[in-house]
């Protein structure tokens, strides 16, 4: 979807009555009432196998893996056609030497894996990551244990008017800043990184305060779905490449 279509009234965000039925089993209680069920068995098995394979790739010992969870849009009611399957290995970082460096290492492994693989389940990309077992998740965000085959936290339905003028203005505020840097070919890396960090912290503040359906998180998701998060990241990488390249001809 183009940004001008968003301004006219369209949105990339969705809120459903049920979880994604391509992935989840459901036994309706009544018409339009379908509680969160279990993940389809064959999908669960595939994701567990992939998670352990990724752990070997990342050189994470199996004994530090405490659980494997599914979270993100496809474990909630706000999934879209572009939502990932977010598979996280919960690891005991206390059992890792140089645990202060492990976060950067895991992020690097995730990014390298994503650059070289395109794994999909029912048409949805699978993103694998690892996080500390004690790391909190937003209270209203669905979290499903693949190993235990049950919900750790069941997803909740909340309504946010994503077509309101105030919501659109906030998205436009960030879009205008991103476009300003790119259109004016701003080369100030510190300023670019500050904008990236501003957007990241804006989202984190919302997740901590009100969770998955926070105003701030939905603004971020709209920016991401419209392509502006990647647009800013790609521009920053181009500026870095140009800064450190040299041609004497």
Residue spans of the language-model regions?
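Short acidic, low-complexity intrinsically disordered linear motifs used
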Residues: 1-10
């Amino acid at each position: 979807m183009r940004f001008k279509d968003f301004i006219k009234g369209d949105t990339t965000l969705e809120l459903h009555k049920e979880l994604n039925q391509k992935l989840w089993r459901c036994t309706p209680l009544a018409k339009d009432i379908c509680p969160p069920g279990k993940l389809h068995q064959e999908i669960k098995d595939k994701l567990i196998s992939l998670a352990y394979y990724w752990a070997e790739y990342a050189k994470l010992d199996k004994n530090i893996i405490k659980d494997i969870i599914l979270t993100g849009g496809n474990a909630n009611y706000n999934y879209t056609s572009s939502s990932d399957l977010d598979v996280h290995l919960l690891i005991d970082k206390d059992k890792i030497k140089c645990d202060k460096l492990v976060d950067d290492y895991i992020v690097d492994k995730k990014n390298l894996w994503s650059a070289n693989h395109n794994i999909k389940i029912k048409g949805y990309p699978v993103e694998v990551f690892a996080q500390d077992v004690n790391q909190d998740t937003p209270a209203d965000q669905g979290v499903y244990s693949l190993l235990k085959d049950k919900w750790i936290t069941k997803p909740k339905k909340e309504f946010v008017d994503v077509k309101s003028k105030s919501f659109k203005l906030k998205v436009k505020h960030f879009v205008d800043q991103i476009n300003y840097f790119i259109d004016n070919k701003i080369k100030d890396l510190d300023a670019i990184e500050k904008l990236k960090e501003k957007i990241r912290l804006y989202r984190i503040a919302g997740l901590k305060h009100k969770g998955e359906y926070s105003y701030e998180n939905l603004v971020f998701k709209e920016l991401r779905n419209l392509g502006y998060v990647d647009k800013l990241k790609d521009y920053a990488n181009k500026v870095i490449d140009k800064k450190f390249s040299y041609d004497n001809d």
